[in-house]
Amino acid sequence: MEFAAILRWLGWCSFVHRLSDDVLEDSARSLWTVPDLFAVFTVSGQTSSALIEVKTSQDMLLKFKKSYLQRLHAYAELMTQPLLIAWRPRAVGFWILFDPRIAQPSTDESVEIDFALAAKNDLMSILAGDYFIVPNEGAGFRFEYERIGEKKPMADGYEAVFRVSDAYLHDAAGVRSDDVPDSIVWTILSALKDNQEVHEDGFVQSFVASGGMTRAQMVLRTAVGFSLKDEERIHWKAVGNNLNAVMSCDGLLHDAESRFGTFMSYIFHLQPVEIPSFLPAGWRGRSAKGKATGETPATGSTKHVDG
């Protein structure tokens, strides 16, 4: 349900349906395996659909038995639909979408896809509308604490009572910013590093953007999961059924574009090394808007980053 909810939030998936393998027993059933999802994508009046098998893994390598993939492909051919694999390695925390035909032989009976191969062929941007964001390094939150009362010496330092004297959000130049949309806050929170400055009468704790890259889908995960306790899980079905309660993916993109230079450095729309043949002719995905890609694109064309 997590992947389906993320597809709907990204905005280009106009319909997603969870399929079931619960059918009457039949000898022909051994020929097919029903994938997890059927999804329809619509962009600028063009429509594309696909069957999607959803997988997660602890490590950065995904393996399939050849017979299993053959049954998935057989069902897809029966339905005259392309077959895709959605994969989330738990170590990285985001979803990749790819055609399983890129898999490499592992043994006589199995194939495998490593993270690098999957990332180069990722369709989440061009098909589903995901994009990469690089928050401006140094933008973030600053908490200033002042000591009240005397210090009590301890074996490895001292103990004292502090209180917050100031707290605010600031841009990459350190300028205090009070009118910042929630979407920018969630974006920064999805790519943080922690800094501390300690002095005699207090200390400063800052949570600032590291300069690393995040993705729209990870900003969503941060927004809906930030207030949960460690043992709590995100209720993705509720998220998918109540998208109006969450910032929109297009709204996040607009807010990021409008704060270029202060809070944002780059926005990338990823293009796979090979455009899938099942996509309609002229399918280009999300259009870039000026310097939101880090440069002014000629004739308004989309800036892509090849995997």
What are these regions (language model features)?
Residues 73-103:
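Nucleic-acid nuclease catalytic cores
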Residues 7, 35-59:
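Conserved catalytic cores of phosphodiester-cleaving nucleases, focusing on short active-site segments
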Residues 98-276:
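Long, charge-rich C-terminal accessory regions
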Residues 1-23, 78, 128-144:
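Acidic-basic catalytic patches of nuclease active cores, encompassing PD-(D/E)XK
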Residues 56-81:
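Mg2+/Mn2+-dependent nuclease catalytic core
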Residues 253-307:
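Hydrophobic, glycine-enriched assembly/anchoring segments
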Residues 17-45, 146-149:
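Active-site metal-binding core of divalent-cation-utilizing nuclease and nuclease-like domains
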Residues 2, 58-59, 104:
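Short, surface-exposed beta-strand-loop junctions and turns on beta-sheet-rich folds
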